[in-house]
From Swiss-Prot:
GO cellular component terms attached to this protein's record: cytosolic large ribosomal subunit
Subunit architecture: Part of the 50S ribosomal subunit.
Coiled coil spans: none
Keyword Ribosomal protein part of the UniProt annotation: yes
GO MF assignments: structural constituent of ribosome
Cited PROSITE patterns: RIBOSOMAL_L30
Organism of derivation: Mycobacterium sp. (strain JLS)
GO biological process, one term: translation
Residue stretches spanning the membrane: none
Name under which the protein is recorded: Large ribosomal subunit protein uL30
CDD domains: Ribosomal_L30 (cd01658)
Family listed: Belongs to the universal ribosomal protein uL30 family.
């Protein structure tokens, strides 16, 4: 399966609770931190919640 590189580019100050929890679930804690995750429906749903806080690249 394909993998996605997810990088947090904006902070969570002023973000809603579910957006903060989605970032934590993805494994992101700091700005400019990147993680590689499998491309599946669960990951896509989390990204959809925080699309304005992250940048997604296909690896």
């Amino acid at each position: 399966m394909a993998e996605l590189k997810i990088t947090q580019v904006r902070g969570t100050i002023g973000a809603r609770w579910n957006q903060r929890e989605s970032l934590r679930t993805l494994g992101l804690r700091k700005i400019r931190q990147s993680v590689v995750r499998e491309d599946n429906a669960q990951t896509r749903g989390l990204i959809k919640t925080v699309h304005h806080l992250v940048v997604v690249e296909e690896v």
